[in-house]
Amino acid sequence: MEKFTIYKGTSVPVMNDNIDTDQIIPKQFLKAIDKKGFGKNLFYEWRYLKDYDENPDFILNAPKYKKASLLISGDNFGSGSSREHAAWALSDYGFRAIIAGSYSDIFYNNALKNGLLPIKQPREVLNQLTKLSSQEEITIDLPHQLIITSLGDFHFEIDPIWKDKLINGLDDIGITLQYEEAISAYEQKNQ
């Protein structure tokens, strides 16, 4: 998993509440088990008209938001089914963090497990962030738990264990590999 310490990127506001995992990545695209390739179908029903013709009315298709890597959204983001593919699609598209009012618990944990930082903020802060220029870089300072913008700095909470995992780029396998020597010694001893 890629380390997440201090990240700078532009943002795109998709301010709907209750964006569910089927809207994030529809079920017809869930056949693969490799984490790559899902970004093309992120928000498929909203991004495309038919045959992958871009919907000019969907914000991600606006040229000024094409390189955005921070998603700002409303409450209850990632609700619905427990598909981990939703986090894969957001990451594969290029998002490194999501700033929303709240998340479904399963999506929140899936995002963290895949190196995608879900940040919770109150509606007042979300409304301020949507007023930023599409060209303004927002800084996410994970060690200090800050969102840094021209409008001010906004603190966010994160479980210290997840914070450490993200800063060190450690997923569950990476953590297990830290104990590889001890595991091997145990296996040798107990054969």
Swiss-Prot record:
Root EC class: lyase
Pathway in which this enzyme or protein is active: Amino-acid biosynthesis; L-leucine biosynthesis; L-leucine from 3-methyl-2-oxobutanoate: step 2/4
| Alphabetized InterPro entries for the sequence | 3-IsopropMal_deHydase_ssu, Aconitase/3IPM_dehydase_swvl, AconitaseA/IPMdHydase_ssu_swvl, IPMI_Swivel, LeuD
SUPFAM superfamilies per UniProt = LeuD/IlvD-like (SSF52016)
Reactions catalysed according to its record: (2R,3S)-3-isopropylmalate = (2S)-2-isopropylmalate
Kindly indicate whether the keyword Lyase belongs to this entry. Answer: yes
EC nos: 4.2.1.33
Q: Report whether Amino-acid biosynthesis shows up as a keyword of the record.
A: yes
Q: Pfam families, alphabetically?
A: Aconitase_C
Report the GO terms under cellular component: 3-isopropylmalate dehydratase complex
What's a single GO MF annotation on this record?
A: 3-isopropylmalate dehydratase activity
Quote the subunit structure annotation: Heterodimer of LeuC and LeuD.
The family this protein is said to belong to? Belongs to the LeuD family. LeuD type 1 subfamily.
Question: Which protein, by its recorded name, is this?
Answer: 3-isopropylmalate dehydratase small subunit
The organism encoding this protein is: Lactococcus lactis subsp. lactis (strain IL1403)
Species lineage:
Bacteria, Bacillati, Bacillota, Bacilli, Lactobacillales
Q: Which gene encodes it?
A: leuD
